């Protein structure tokens, strides 16, 4: 049998069973697949096929992803790990952006949404920040009423509404149902202890971004930096975490190689 036929058969079998595999499962960003396509000078579909063959089971996508790319991912059996919406709440009410995000979720069958709430301009007063937080809480409640889960991550910019533990605590105090996307590398970025942050927010963690970092701040493949990844994964599993582990290394110049190394490292850590 030709190699291409064997690959298609393998991917077909993955598509049939991957969404029913034991948790946690490993996913990747659709943006990383697009980067692979660009770096390898191949189509998005071919890049997605190669990534799927590495045994990635899910994908994180923007709610503005091109329709043809979304169809490709679905056809290859990628599970819906998490959708992502950038909504700048500090700029005022965001009805149009909210409607777009919710429409995508419902039309395409996604249940988890990472909300990236924008950056706070320098000099913004605290009343404006409180108004933005109230808008976020209202959107989260509305989405929950429609059966959707909304989360925020620890975002690596000091002007973010969810930059560090203190900022996240402020958001979570405003919404009992707001979830957390735990980004391992971003706690290191804001000079906080990753494991302490995990213990602090464990009850809110509903999705995970496995981002490693080097001392210079760059993001290598999982296991190539100084983030205690094995300990993070071990604590998540011990606590009964049933969500996704999405590998992340934006900025990689060898994205396919990093994707291959990352999933191998994560599988090895989970096998212990």
Give the residues covered by each predicted segment.
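Bacterial N-terminal signal peptides
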Residues: 8-15
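Conserved, mostly hydrophobic/aromatic
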Residues: 51, 59, 105, 150, ...
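Active-site beta-loop-alpha junctions enriched in small/polar residues
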Residues: 29-33, 62-64, 85-89, 118-120, ...
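Acidic/histidine-rich catalytic cores of soluble enzymes
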Residues: 144-226
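Structural preference for beta-strand elements that scaffold enzyme active sites
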Residues: 25-27, 58, 79-82, 111-114, ...
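Active-site groove signature of glycoside hydrolases
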Residues: 105-125, 146-156, 246-247
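N-terminal pre-domain/capping segments
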Residues: 19-107, 111, 179, 267-272
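Positively charged n-region of N-terminal signal peptides that target proteins for export
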Residues: 1-5
């Amino acid at each position: 049998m030709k190699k291409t036929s064997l690959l298609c058969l393998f991917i077909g079998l993955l598509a049939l069973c991957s969404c029913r595999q034991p948790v946690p499962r490993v996913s990747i960003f659709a943006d990383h697949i697009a980067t692979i396509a660009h770096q390898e000078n191949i189509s998005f579909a071919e890049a997605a096929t190669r990534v799927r063959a590495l045994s990635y089971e899910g994908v994180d996508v923007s709610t503005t992803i091109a329709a043809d790319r979304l169809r490709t991912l679905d056809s290859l059996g990628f599970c819906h790990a998490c959708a992502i919406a950038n909504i700048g709440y500090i700029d005022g009410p965001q009805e149009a952006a909210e409607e777009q995000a919710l429409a995508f979720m419902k039309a395409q069958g996604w249940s988890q949404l990472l909300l990236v709430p924008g950056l706070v301009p320098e000099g913004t007063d605290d009343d404006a920040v409180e108004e933005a937080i109230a808008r976020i809480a209202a959107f989260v409640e509305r989405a929950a009423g429609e059966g959707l889960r909304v989360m925020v991550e620890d975002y690596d910019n000091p002007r973010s509404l969810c930059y560090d533990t203190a900022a996240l605590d402020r958001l979570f105090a405003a919404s009992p149902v707001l979830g957390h996307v735990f980004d391992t590398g971003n706690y290191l970025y804001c000079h906080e202890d990753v494991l302490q942050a995990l213990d602090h927010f464990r009850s809110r963690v509903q999705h995970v971004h496995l981002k490693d970092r080097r001392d210079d701040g760059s993001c290598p493949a999982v296991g190539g930096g100084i983030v205690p990844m094995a300990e993070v994964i071990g604590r998540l599993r011990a606590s009964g975490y049933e969500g996704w582990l999405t590998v992340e290394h934006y900025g990689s110049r060898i994205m396919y190689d990093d994707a291959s190394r990352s999933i191998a490292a994560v599988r090895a850590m989970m096998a212990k």
